[in-house]
Amino acid sequence: CGTGMGIHIAASKCPHVHAGVVESVPAALRAITGNGVNVLAMGAFYVAPQMGCDIADAYLGASLGSGYEWWKNFYEFHKLAIDELEAFDYEAYKKNGFHVDKLGDYPLKLEVKPD
């Protein structure tokens, strides 16, 4: 796969797969810590073999919310988003005239990382 985009599109069609295209260690970390991706897609045009190994190692060593413990409710907010994705029913969405029913709210507040 040259860009990672094709496999990302294919994988994302499978139930419960949350794929992310990543080209760096920071992107992989954010993909898991903030978005809960469970499949990484990397393109050989942009990710060298050693970088791919570093990306995989970083991803495998992280989890949703890790590194953001200082940010109050970071995990809870992002978990809510993942749960909404998991609960999404495409057939009901189609029958509802492609209108998204709101599943929940979570209060947001800007947090500043302590020094």
Describe every region a protein language model picked out.
Residues G6-H18:
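Short Gly/Thr/Asp-enriched flexible loops that form oxyanion-binding sites at enzyme active sites
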Residues C1-G2, G43:
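Conserved residues at beta->alpha junctions
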Residues T3-G6, V47:
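Gly/Ser/Thr-rich loops at beta-strand to alpha-helix junctions
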Residues V25-D115:
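C-terminal binding/interaction regions
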Residues T3, G20-S24:
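Glycine/small-residue-rich loop that forms an oxyanion/phosphate-binding "nest" at active or ligand-binding sites
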Residues H18-A19, V39:
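Secondary-structure boundary/capping signal
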